Every structure is written in C-alpha cells, then in structure tokens.
Regions:
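OB-fold and OB-like single-stranded nucleic-acid-recognition modules
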Residues: 1-185
C-alpha cells in the first residue's frame, strides 16, 4: 500500500480580503504567552475577481520549534498590520499578490440542529506557506490547482431525461484488490 498520500493545493492571486487576527496564547496552552496569527485569507485567482479561494490558518507562530523564523508568520503579520493591502479595503492597485502552497483539510465540529447533535465535516484549504510575489501566472487556470490521491467510492448521477438521481458505486472494498489497491480496512 502507498505510504504517503499526495495532498497539495497551489493558489496564486490577489489578496481579496482577510479576517486574520494577531493573538497571544493563554495560560493553559503548551507555550503560554506565545504570539500567533489565526484566521482566513481570501485569494482572488482570476482577473475578474470572481473566483475567491479561502485559506484558513489555525495557529501560525513567529518561529518554528527549532527557533528558525517563520516566513509565513511575517507575511501574515504584514497583512494584519496593513503593510500588504487587500482588494476590498485598499483597491486593486494596493492589493498584494500572493502564492499559497497549502493542503486540503477538514474542519470538523458538532452542531445542534433541531435538538440533535450532528457532526459537520467541512473541507477547506488549511495552512501552508504564503509568499508575496511580484507577478502572477498569465494562465488563470493554473493559479488554483490541487493534486490529491483519493478513492472515489460513490458518485451521484443525475439524468434529466428521467428526473431521478441514482447512485453508482465505483469502487467497493471487495473489488479494490483487483484494481491494484490494498484493501483499506
């Protein structure tokens, strides 16, 4: 079975908006009093500013555990303090161009819906490396890409001629070995 799975996103564009906040970790944290940045940046990947891709950062500190400076923190801090502008706040001319290399992740939490606790698993771009760039790729199609190893075990097909949805099981546990996959139990 494959030992490492590919999970990469590449996002280039103009900083559209953000809700980043500079905070300090509390007394009960592993490293109390540590400054960190949390929040979301939204990147416009097309020139028309219609394809907006959010990237969430949970906990970004100024240095790595090794003590080496964290360039992502520096970039995010420049966004927080206004050194780098955003399209919505400062206009297109002052909005910073960014490249983000991230990964897909899950934001899982429980919510109370109609008196019943329910698990919500929302997919999002989580963290990664953020760099200020001077130019963007001319081809808008390559500004927002992802590579991921995945197994599709079910798809829903809609046939408008019969107005019904039906489910097609593509890969099941019983036939994965015949396709060259190790069984994932």
């Amino acid at each position: 079975m494959k030992k490492t799975m590919i999970n990469q996103t590449h996002i280039e564009g103009i900083l559209y908006e953000h809700d980043l906040q500079a905070k300090v970790s509390g007394d009960t944290s592993k490293n109390p009093g540590t400054p960190f940045i949390t929040g979301t940046i939204s990147i416009a990947t097309d020139d028309a500013m219609t394809n907006i891709v959010p990237v969430h950062f949970t906990y970004v500190t100024a240095t790595f555990g090794s003590g080496k400076p964290n360039d992502t923190y520096t970039t995010l801090n420049n966004i927080v303090n206004g050194t780098f502008g955003s399209y919505m706040k400062d206009g297109a001319d002052k909005a910073v161009k960014l490249r983000v290399d991230s990964a897909l992740g899950l934001n899982e939490f429980y919510t109370d819906r109609n008196g019943k606790e329910e698990l919500v698993s929302a997919k999002r771009n989580e963290g990664g490396f953020v760099h200020k760039v001077d130019t963007l790729d001319e081809d808008e199609k390559v500004r927002n890409t992802f590579k991921a190893d995945m197994i599709i075990n079910c798809v829903t097909h809609y046939d408008p001629t019969i107005s019904n949805f039906y489910i097609i099981h593509i890969i099941s546990h019983s036939n994965m070995d015949s396709l060259g996959f190790d069984t994932l139990y």
